[in-house]
Amino acid sequence: MNSKKIEELDKTTNHLDNSRNNMYSCTFMEKGDEDNILNSTILKMNNTEKGISFQTIEEEIKDKNKISNIPSDYAEKEKYCFNELLYTKQNGYINIIEKEDKPIQEILTDDKKNISEIDSSKSDKMDPCLSSQKVDEEYKYGDNYNINGDNPVHNSDEINEDSKCECSFFISKCDYEKDSDANTNGPKKSCKDSEENINYYNNNLLLGISENKDTLIKCDKIFERSYYSTSASTVLASNENEQNLQNISSYETVSSMNEKIKLDGNGKYEKLEKEQTYIMNKETNVINPQDYSIHDIGTYRDECISYLNKIKDIPHNIGSQINSYQNNNIIGNNNFKDKSYLIHENDFFDVETKKKNILQNYFLVNNNNEINANEDMNNRSDDLKNIEAVASDLNEIIEEDTIQKKINISKNCKIEENINMNINDHNKNAVFNFNINRQLFHDNQGDENMYKTNFNTENNKSINIINGMSKEVYEQNSGDIHAQVENINNIEQTTNNIIENNMMIIQGSDDLRFTTLNCINDNSNTDIMKCKRKIKNDENRENIMIKTDQKNIKMKDELDEDDKDELYGIPDKKRRKKNKKKKIPGRVYKVIVRGKECWRAEWLVQKNQENIEREKEESKMDRYSIMKLENTKDVDKNINKMNTPNFQKKSKQFSVSVYGYENARLFALFELIKYNSVPDSLKEEASICIHNIKRNIMNSENSSNKSFSGHFLQFLLADENNEYSSLLYKRLEDNVIQNVNKYSMHEMNNINRMNLFQTQGKEIGFRNEKYFTVQYDNENGHGNNIVDGTIWNIQNNERNLFYNNNNKCRNDYYYNNSNDIIKMKKENNEKLTTFNDNNFYNKANYINRYNNPYVSNNNPSIHNLNNLVYNINSYDFNPMHIRNGYGNDSNSTINISSPNSNYHRGFGEEKDIQKKKNFFNINNTRKYVGDINNKPMDGFKQNLFEKVLNNLENNMGNNNLYNYNSLEHHINSKVKSTYPYNNDNITNDPANTTTMISHGANNNQISNETEIRNSQQILHDNLLVYRNFMNPSSCDIGNVDKNSENDRGEKMASNFEGAFLNKSNIVFKQNANFDPFLGRNVSNINT
């Protein structure tokens, strides 16, 4: 460089290109043979200043690290210089560590011998300080090498007036040719005054930082060897995004002189060129240093085998050669060259060792470069000599990179771990770097230089790693690193904190981490230490007793109660028991959403439930297909660990400002009720919830119209005698479900297939025959009772001719197990109808009950809350004056008959009528067409009318209170009736006819009480019910066909699709599209 450019770099105000926003700082410290720093320079590239400046920090470094009194033995033997690390987290420095055991001048001279002999006079002129001039010296291979030696400037004012420049330090700018050939003996490099790259050459390492801000360039070497130092050079870089120390170093054999490594945003490195070298890839698939320096890897047999099998394929080949030593005696000598070979315990543990000691020392030996051990035997330490002497009988003797590990557990429960590492000069395929801050200090004896390394973590725990730099290290060029881990209370937690803080980019698998041995002393026996530790069980699933030469270690499961109390530190020998958090199906809690207070309901729903419901509704499948779909999608709804993936969490919140504080919580609770997710703790509150909602909304002047929408409807229409009442179980025997179908077809599918009138009412929540009292409104037992009590007494064979055990002829297909449809129906019923605490809010129990015997003008129910609910529910066409009656409140055809009527007794007589009836489907509209003869009808048939009653809504005009238009059911038949008319001629008066109820909700208006009562009365008077003989069969009294049940069961779906028969032969049909409150105005009802 010329003096002008040096001056520019020396100015802190000098700014680089604005695009360079990821700057670093480099610290170079060089020490001579005395106790002073020869040259210290920081290349600071600050993120804010975006400039480069050179500063000398000699005194600052000296004071910080207390560098002094380097033993004279080193000076007598040889000179040594190295660069030391100073890492400042705030500034994000790049730090380069160089340790050399030869004088800089000698190293440079030796390195250049293979290229060109350097004149000693020129070598003497080499100035280590930054010079104002640049001399280009041409070498044999065409390299332009920039040194600052021809015109040395010893005036250090340009850099630092206190600097003593006795070690070499070079700066040059380098551009690289893209067509560089890695196979040539010499590199192709042109060094010129280019602004593209700024490279710093120190000893045998040249680090380039380009203006590209994310590229570190490894420049060419003057000598053809690895550019890393022969001992243990380490490059530590910090990434701007994470501002944490990153370790990017590896010891590798470099075949190319112009390798490039790209630094990405995550602090990882990717090789851009020359695939033949092993370098750190972008996945950083290397061994985590913690596995060597911190954890007790190899302590136990199974864990050691597992670990070694995991690391055998590491690119750096550590672990490819494994030999275990006990007391400096080799135990195994297998040479593992095949990467696919799985290590077995017999490869490095003999039988005797298994019995005596599992906790032992071992070596990880690298076998990449094989040489004759005799050439280097004298250069090894005494300990290594002994090891290699034992291994001399191997077929291939190598000079190896080794890592020696020794773990001791002291009586005070401290883990003492010693690690020795030897990196051979010719083999750079090992990874062992401490990503750390290092401070120089002296031990007590003063005969050994030590670096004390601190790992600072979030919990302020410190790991002290001692790196030895003994005299033997430098004399024998071994570069050993001795590390001892002291005072570690929780190794695993500390290591995890280091990784979480991104102090290491090398990441290890969780499988390679091992827990700490937490030990306690046995007072009765000082030689026994009791520890808790997770280990693998043997084949017999018995805990392994681990024994060492020093102590016996007893596993956690073998500790007695007193030992466990002492181990866990629990007073009075009362151990804590962790309460397992029980998952609940739903919960209600308060949250703040966008600054507003809300009550949120949270529940779990089956993942595929919505898809099932949508599929059933859109496809309009028949009953058999729906049952088949539900059975295939059946999932256990009990929340546990096994079926948790079958559920997904949903939530909904209600603002206090909109609904009010009390109502917001109640509405949230309604969400849980809707999705069958009320926890046990909220059941009592759910009982009160219905009453409060009705009180606050139905009777409140300030109530919102939102209360009538959606799933709140069934609660608003329920009276106080609903299933949420605290007296529910007492009322089950006194109340009958009336309005079963408060849901659409797909939701009530199972309910509609239930045998609602079976006698086991007490078990499933329905009426028990035992407590039922038959009521008649007139003497003959028929009168105005469209549905009388006799339909509940199914077991009375005298009344129910179709359920007669003697003639074996029955219309109850529910119990016909020979049919697959019926089997599935029974299974679904059993799931749905079990009435207990777990499903007390079952859909089958969303009912609308009323207790008043009948409603008339003299007893208006509009003034009673219970009847108000009923009257609002004007689409319910139940007979008003029938106590405990049953009716369906959706647009469906209900076929009900009394088994006590003369109609049953005349079954044989009416058989011909049944044969003339046909059921068929046209455009999804089921029509009943038939021609019944002019035979008189008696009894229950008094309420059947003459013709199709589908003209009522047309005659009533637009003000029709019941504009039912979604589905029409027509009965084209002439039926003579004795009631309510006095003659046999059926009138055609529209007032006495009605459409078979097909629910719609377009423009329905209910303006006052009178209209409600009148509409109910009209609906009651014109209610059409009929007995269904839809399946022709030979079943008759005294004429029994054994196959008749199967025949009827098979024909039921085809002849009357979507219908359901119970024991009383009552047929149910539903329409899923009915919305009772759509467009309906109920605001004018006087309460």
Curated annotation (Swiss-Prot):
Annotated Gene Ontology cellular component terms: chromosome; nucleus
GO terms of biological process kind: development of symbiont in host; DNA-templated transcription
Keyword set, alphabetical order: Chromosome, DNA-binding, Nucleus, Transcription, Transcription regulation
Disulfide-linked positions: none
GO MF terms, alphabetically ordered: DNA binding
Cleaved signal peptide residues: none
Keyword check for Nucleotide-binding: no
Subcellular location, record wording: Nucleus; Chromosome
Null mutant phenotype: Asexual blood stage is normal. Female and male gametocytes are formed but fail to develop into mature ookinetes. Zygote development is arrested at the ookinete retort stage; however, meiotic replication proceeds normally. In the zygote, transcription of several genes is affected. Infection of mosquitos with knockout parasites results in a lack of oocyst formation.
Start-end of DNA-binding region: 586-682
Highest taxon in the source lineage: Eukaryota
Keyword Transport: no
Entry note about domains: The AP2 domain contains a non-canonical linker peptide between the second and third sheets.
Its job: Transcription factor which binds the 5'-[TC][AC]TG[AT]AC[AG]-3' motif. During the mosquito vector stage, plays an essential role in the zygote for de novo transcription of genes required for ookinete formation.
Family classification: Belongs to the AP2/ERF transcription factor family. AP2 subfamily.
Name assigned to this protein: Transcription factor AP2-Z
Species: Plasmodium berghei (strain Anka)
Lineage, broadest ranks: Eukaryota, Sar, Alveolata, Apicomplexa, Aconoidasida
